[in-house]
Amino acid sequence: MVKWRNFYLMKIYDSKNKYIGVVDDISIDFYNGVVKGFTISPASIFKKHTYVSVDSIISVDEIMKIKNTSRFEGLKFKEIKYMDIINKEKKLLGVLEDLIIDEKTFEIKGMIISSGIF
């Protein structure tokens, strides 16, 4: 199991060892509880942010090796990070801090919630 922050700023290379950029965010399918892909902050200032789906990932270790990039799809984690988490009794539990992800299947296994300072 790994956290979202383990992927943040990870270097990405294609199958020909060309440097593509770094991981900027993850794309999630919250209803199915899976990571769909990663948004990439490109190495070149002339390229827009790009995206790689989990199907195009060859390997993940210290760096990420990919086959190709594609169009973005899904919900970005940064859009929901620090969102208030409320239980069924409408009691505030805290804010969403991080996700726990299975590094082989890219399933979201849990959420880290910070209670903050009250």
Named regions from a protein language model:
Residues 1-118:
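Peripheral interaction segments used for macromolecular assembly
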